[in-house]
């Protein structure tokens, strides 16, 4: 089990201290991180570190965690690094929270053993979250039927085709009852900050965000926003810049002549660029 060495704790603010003083006695909450082969290192590390920082800022052990996985030995993340696991897929305590850590090629790594384990723990009433592509084994196990969920944008189309019974959204994270899902990347931070706020108040969650230099905390109302080149399927710097300017000035549109001048081309060149790549005028 991973626990914080409290000798490493830094000071917390008097405001946070006052908030936590109203919470005694504090019950420690344990998270079981289930690492699935090729899991996203960013999504996983973001979630664990949010818990670590919460402990540090509170100067007490609010959270503990352990790392589990099929086989219980070692497992590789998306960066190719091997992680030593604390154990195999065991039966957990009823007040534990499960975090399924997915990554690339999740379809190939959602084994029958993992799916059966997910179903069993869901029947026992444990809250289960899927980080990055962790929503896939959750849906495959049937525990997202009729639930709202999200998944990384690369997997959205295939997921919606395979799991029509899941209400898929483009949100950065979703919390629907005992089921939680994230879109990957830093969206793990947003989910963990919500959990920390629900458990111990927004002051502590904000203190954790500040430590992570995370200035814009997102909610489940925020959607995955892709870059202009990804959305339009074209890697053309000037075209991307023009579209970005158009999107930020919807209420007061900029004329094509000014747009063209701002990116160093003529209006006619801009019109040709739009027709060539987007089959439309500016």
Give the residues covered by each predicted segment.
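Residues at the C-termini of beta-strands that transition into short coil/loop
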Residues: 69-71, 87, 153, 172, ...
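Residues that mark the start of a beta-strand
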Residues: 28-30, 148, 178
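Structural detector of well-ordered beta-strand residues that form the stable sheet scaffold
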Residues: 128-129, 150, 169, 180
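Conserved anion/nucleotide-ligand pocket segment
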Residues: 171-213
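Extended, subdomain-level signal for the structured scaffold at the beginning of enzyme domains
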Residues: 1-128, 136-141, 193, 197, ...
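A conserved active-site-flanking secondary-structure segment within enzyme catalytic domains
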Residues: 145-173, 207-208, 212
């Amino acid at each position: 089990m991973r626990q914080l060495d409290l000798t490493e704790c830094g000071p917390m603010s008097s405001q946070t201290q006052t908030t936590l003083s109203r919470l005694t006695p504090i019950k420690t909450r344990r998270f079981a991180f289930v690492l699935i082969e090729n899991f996203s290192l960013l999504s996983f590390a973001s979630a664990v570190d949010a818990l670590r920082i919460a402990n540090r800022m509170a100067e007490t052990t609010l959270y503990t965690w352990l790392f589990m996985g099929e086989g219980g030995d070692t497992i590789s993340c998306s960066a190719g690094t091997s992680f030593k696991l604390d154990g195999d897929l065991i039966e957990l305590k009823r007040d534990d929270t499960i975090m399924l850590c997915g990554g690339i090629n999740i379809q190939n790594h959602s084994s029958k053993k993992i799916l059966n384990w997910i179903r069993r723990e869901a029947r026992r009433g444990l809250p289960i979250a899927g980080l990055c592509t962790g929503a896939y084994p959750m849906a495959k196990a049937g525990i997202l039927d009729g639930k709202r969920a999200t998944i990384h944008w690369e997997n959205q189309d295939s997921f919606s085709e395979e799991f029509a019974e899941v209400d898929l959204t483009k949100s950065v994270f979703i919390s629907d009852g005992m089921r939680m899902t994230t879109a990957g990347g830093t969206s793990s931070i947003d989910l963990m900050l919500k959990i920390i706020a629900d458990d111990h108040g927004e002051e502590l969650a904000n203190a954790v965000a500040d430590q992570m230099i995370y200035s814009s905390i997102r909610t489940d109302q925020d959607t995955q926003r892709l870059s202009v080149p990804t959305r339009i399927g074209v890697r053309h710097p000037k075209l991307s810049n023009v579209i970005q300017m158009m999107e930020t000035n919807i209420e007061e549109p900029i004329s094509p002549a000014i747009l063209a001048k701002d990116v160093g081309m003529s209006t006619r060149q801009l019109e040709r660029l739009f027709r060539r790549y987007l089959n439309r005028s500016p």
